[in-house]
């Protein structure tokens, strides 16, 4: 049993693979190559890392004669005409595929840094063949392709599906852009929070550093005071130390002022940058709200357009269904009309055949009637004449006694004949009976003219047999009756013949009566002949009337049938014409409605195209603005990172200074302790106790400051770590968003490039057509110029010929005048040069006229 076939053909944007011819005897697995299953031309295994091992299934359903494709929980998805069958890692329901569909297994994998496709996906065009070898049906008009009879219908059928797909893709892109904008807004909010936290941490760290500087300065002052108190110096040395201390104080104040000024400047710059960031954030929020409103409006318009498009498609489908129904009704009516026409034609043919058969029967009956009439007349002539002759011969041949003896028998026979003739009424059967009786009579009278009777009997028998054979079919009942009568008569004749010869005397007496009876019989026979002729004429007239009536009835039936047929044909034609007119009107109305709907859908599509272009431009502007905002945010992030690094460096420097100050402070404390131990003996108790108390207070403050410094440093490190982690996360998210935006930008650029290429192709085709038209126009112009030049030349030649003709006519007139003058002179006086002058005139005329003809001829 043959099986269905699926052919996978590689497309240019696909991972390269050989063309696959896969027979679908059973469900075929589509997936990545493994050790047990390698790629081959008769399987659906591909050497591609994007595919899963069990990516999809393809099979052919013999019940419905359809092909199906199912995604079996693939990670990267399966696409039919850029539409995904299911979500990630979910099994899709079986989806019908048609011949010519574009099937994609997986998606392209790209690098974020170089934006280069590292692993391509499988993109193929599938061709499907049924088990009988025929190609499966292609995708219908409402999805991708729509080949219709006219280019207008092609545009009306093809462009809506393409633009609906583009609108769907644009809506998807806009949704993705909105999602990215929301993510960017969230990231900006987190950045703002981080900036606020970093500002607070920096403020607290600066405040802690300032407090620490103050404490250190106080410690130094107190140390100096301790040194001054511990030393017993003179006033000059004390003055010098005071001056040095004042200078140190002044230097510390200047450094503190400069540091404060720098901190204030940095704070002002940070505030300014923060205000700029807030301003840009508000602008981006306004733009986001505007874009969101635009997106909502475009989505509403897209929904309205989709609804209108679906309504138009449904109306077109309804109209097409109505057209099909009307065409079906028209075909049914035509079929019914043809069937009725065929039935009527068959009835007409049957009636004509019956008419021919009836005519043949009528002719046959007419011929039989004529033949029977001729036979009857012939039989009457043949039978009656011999009977008369017999009677005469018998009368003449019989002598006195014999005649007298047989007269009563003859009279009895004549009476019987008259009786039989009166019974039969001139029927041919009675003639046959009469012949039989005559035979019996002649057998009794055998001594009378045997030879003549035998010859007559033989003739009569032959004629009777012929008549019986001719009239056996029509006169069978009369034969039966006549046969019964003849048998009865024969019996009666036998009884009469068996009577004794005693009746001879009676016969003699009745001779005269016999002669009278004979004459009466002759008269009766003549009367019967007349009646028979009249009956024959009446039969002929009745038959003729019957034939005429039958013919008239047939003619009337034929005419009525023809009239019925003509009326039915006219009614059918009228109904067909009316129905055709109605169908034409319906078709015209439907065509007009379809044209109006197509024009309205075209206008809507043109407006949708304009809106799509505007949306493209708005999306491009939004993408460019988003890119600029993203770049500015990246620059600001870089600046913030640089500032954070500067702050970190400053904090590290401050920490180093604090450590150095702590080390110096510890050294000084040790020195002070040594000096205090040395001078403990010198100092008195009250001052030493005061200094110890102050020292303890300062130590406690120093410890508390150290603890605060440790806490602030740990808090600063924690915040720096959080800031670093958040900045890394945000940078990763921003890079991923940037890659997605770049991918969408590339897709939009590819779409714009394809649209531009299509536009360029159309423009090139139009240019070629325009160039061809221009060339044709130039050729026509050249031909026109050539014809104009030829016409001008012909006009000039015509004018020249006209001038020459005019000049020749003038010269001829002059010559005629000269000839007249010469003739007049010749009449007055004979001139011998007259023929010479005529010849010269003719020669000059020929010389002047022939070149003009030669010029005018080309």
Swiss-Prot record:
TM helices/strands, residue ranges: 833-853
GO molecular function, one term: small GTPase binding
Any one of the GO BP annotations: regulation of sodium ion transmembrane transport
Modified residues (Phosphoserine): 150, 472, 476
Chain intervals for the UniProt region annotation (Disordered): 456-492
Principal location listed in the UniProt entry: membrane
Biased composition (Basic and acidic residues): 456-470
Residues in the Cytoplasmic compartment per record: 1-832
Membrane side Extracellular: residue ranges: 854-858
UniProt entry tagged with the keyword Mitochondrion: yes
Entry's localization field: Cell membrane, Sarcolemma; Cytoplasm, Cytoskeleton, Microtubule organizing center, Centrosome; Endoplasmic reticulum membrane; Mitochondrion membrane
Region described as Necessary for targeting to centrosomes: 1-165
FHA domain residues: 28-85
The keyword Cytoplasm belongs to this UniProt entry's keyword annotation: yes
InterPro entries found in the cross-reference section: Cent_Immune-Sig_Mod, FHA_dom, SMAD_FHA_dom_sf
GO CC annotation: centrosome; cytoplasm; endoplasmic reticulum membrane; FAR/SIN/STRIPAK complex; membrane; mitochondrial membrane; sarcolemma
Gene3D superfamilies, A to Z: 2.60.200.20
Lipid bilayer topology: Single-pass type IV membrane protein
Coiled-coil region: 169-204, 232-381, 516-829
A Pfam family assignment: FHA
Annotated domain remarks: Alternative spliced transmembrane domains determine subcellular targeting. Isoforms 1, 2, 3 and 4 are targeted to endoplasmic reticulum membrane as well as mitochondrion membrane. Isoform 5 is not targeted to mitochondrion membrane but to endoplasmic reticulum membrane.
The family this protein is said to belong to: Belongs to the SLMAP family.
Assembly information from the UniProt record: Homodimer. Interacts with myosin. Interacts with SIKE1 and both associate with the STRIPAK core complex composed of PP2A catalytic and scaffolding subunits, the striatins (PP2A regulatory subunits), the striatin-associated proteins MOB4, STRIP1 and STRIP2, PDCD10 and members of the STE20 kinases, such as STK24 and STK26. Interacts (via FHA domain) with STK3 (when phosphorylated); the interaction associates STK3 with the STRIPAK complex.
Its biological purpose: Associates with the striatin-interacting phosphatase and kinase (STRIPAK) core complex, forming the extended (SIKE1:SLMAP)STRIPAK complex. The (SIKE1:SLMAP)STRIPAK complex dephosphorylates STK3 leading to the inhibition of Hippo signaling and the control of cell growth. May play a role during myoblast fusion.
Name by which UniProt lists this protein: Sarcolemmal membrane-associated protein
């Amino acid at each position: 049993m043959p099986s269905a076939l699926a052919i996978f053909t590689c497309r240019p944007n696909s991972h390269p693979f050989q063309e696959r011819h896969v027979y679908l005897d059973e469900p075929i697995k589509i997936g990545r190559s493994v050790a047990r299953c390698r790629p081959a031309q008769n399987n659906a295994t591909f050497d591609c890392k994007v595919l899963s091992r069990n990516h999809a299934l393809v099979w052919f359903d013999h019940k419905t004669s359809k092909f199906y494709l199912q995604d079996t929980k693939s990670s990267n998805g399966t696409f039919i005409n850029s539409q995904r069958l299911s979500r990630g890692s979910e099994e899709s329901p079986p989806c019908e595929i048609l011949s010519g569909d574009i099937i994609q297994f997986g998606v392209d994998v790209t690098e974020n840094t170089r934006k280069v496709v590292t692993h391509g996906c499988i993109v193929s065009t599938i061709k499907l063949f049924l088990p009988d070898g025929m190609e499966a049906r292609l995708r219908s008009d409402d999805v991708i392709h729509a080949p219709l009879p006219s280019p207008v219908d092609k545009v009306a059928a093809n462009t809506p599906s393409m633009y609906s797909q583009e609108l769907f893709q644009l809506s998807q892109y806009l949704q993705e852009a909105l999602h990215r904008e929301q993510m960017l807004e969230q990231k900006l909010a987190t950045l703002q929070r981080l900036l606020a936290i970093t500002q607070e941490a920096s403020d607290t760290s600066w405040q802690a550093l300032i407090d620490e500087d103050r404490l250190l300065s106080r410690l130094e002052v107190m140390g100096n005071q301790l040194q001054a108190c511990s030393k017993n110096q003179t006033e000059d040395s004390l003055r010098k130390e005071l001056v040095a201390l004042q200078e140190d104080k002044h230097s510390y104040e200047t450094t503190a002022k400069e540091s404060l000024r720098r901190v204030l400047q940095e704070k002002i710059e940070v505030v300014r940058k923060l205000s700029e960031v807030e301003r840009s954030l508000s602008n981006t929020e306004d733009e986001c709200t505007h874009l969101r409103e635009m997106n909502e409006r475009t989505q509403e318009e897209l929904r309205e357009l989709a609804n209108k498009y679906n309504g138009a498609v449904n109306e077109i489908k309804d109209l097409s269904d109505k057209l099909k129904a009307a065409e079906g009704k028209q075909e049914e009516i035509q079929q019914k009309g043809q069937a009725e026409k065929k039935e009527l034609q068959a009835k007409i043919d049957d009636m004509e055949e019956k008419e021919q058969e009836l005519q043949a029967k009528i002719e046959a009956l007419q011929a039989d009637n004529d033949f029977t009439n001729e036979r009857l007349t012939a039989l009457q002539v043949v039978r009656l004449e011999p009977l008369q002759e017999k009677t005469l011969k018998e009368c003449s041949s019989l002598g006195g006694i014999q005649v007298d003896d047989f007269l009563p028998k003859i009279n009895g026979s004549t009476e019987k004949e008259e009786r039989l003739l009166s019974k039969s009424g001139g029927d041919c059967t009675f003639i046959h009976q009469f012949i039989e009786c005559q035979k019996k009579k002649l057998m009794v009278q055998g001594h009378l003219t045997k030879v003549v009777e035998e010859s007559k009997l033989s003739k009569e028998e032959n004629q009777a047999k012929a008549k019986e054979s001719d009239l056996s079919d029509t006169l069978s009942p009369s034969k039966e009756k006549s046969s019964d009568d003849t048998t009865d008569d024969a019996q009666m004749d036998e009884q009469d013949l068996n009577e004794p010869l005693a009746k001879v005397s009676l016969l003699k007496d009745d001779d005269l009566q016999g002669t009278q009876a004979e004459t009466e019989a002759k008269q009766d026979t003549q009367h019967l002949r007349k009646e028979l002729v009249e009956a024959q004429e009446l039969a002929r007239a009745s038959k003729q009337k019957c034939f005429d009536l039958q013919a008239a009835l047939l003619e009337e039936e034929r005419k009525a049938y023809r009239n019925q047929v003509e009326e039915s044909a006219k009614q059918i034609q009228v109904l067909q014409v009316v129905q055709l007119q109605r169908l034409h009107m319906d078709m015209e109305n439907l065509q007009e409605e379809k044209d109006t709907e197509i024009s309205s859908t075209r206008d809507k599509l043109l407006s949708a195209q304009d809106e799509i272009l505007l949306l493209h431009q708005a999306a491009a502007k939004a993408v460019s603005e988003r890119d600029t905002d993203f770049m500015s945010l990246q620059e600001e992030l870089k600046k913030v990172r640089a500032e954070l690094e500067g702050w970190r460096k400053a904090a590290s420097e401050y920490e180093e200074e604090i450590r150095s100050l702590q080390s110096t402070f510890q050294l000084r404390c040790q020195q002070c302790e040594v000096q205090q131990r040395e001078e403990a003996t010198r100092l008195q108790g009250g001052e030493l106790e005061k200094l110890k108390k102050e020292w303890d207070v300062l130590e406690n403050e120093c410890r508390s400051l150290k603890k605060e410094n440790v806490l602030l440093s740990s808090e600063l490190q924690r915040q720096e770590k959080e800031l670093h982690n958040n900045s890394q996360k945000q940078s990763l998210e921003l890079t991923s968003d940037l890659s997605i935006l770049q991918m969408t930008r590339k897709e939009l650029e590819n779409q714009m490039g394809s649209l531009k290429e299509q536009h360029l192709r159309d423009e090139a085709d139009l240019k070629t057509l325009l160039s061809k038209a221009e060339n044709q126009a130039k050729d026509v112009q050249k031909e026109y110029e050539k014809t104009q030049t030829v016409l001008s030349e012909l006009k000039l030649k015509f004018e020249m010929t006209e001038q020459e003709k005019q000049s020749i006519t003038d010269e001829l007139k002059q010559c005629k005048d000269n000839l007249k003058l010469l003739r007049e002179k010749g009449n007055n006086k004979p001139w011998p040069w007259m023929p010479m002058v005529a010849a010269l005139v003719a020669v000059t005329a020929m010389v002047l006229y022939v070149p003009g003809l030669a010029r005018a001829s080309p």
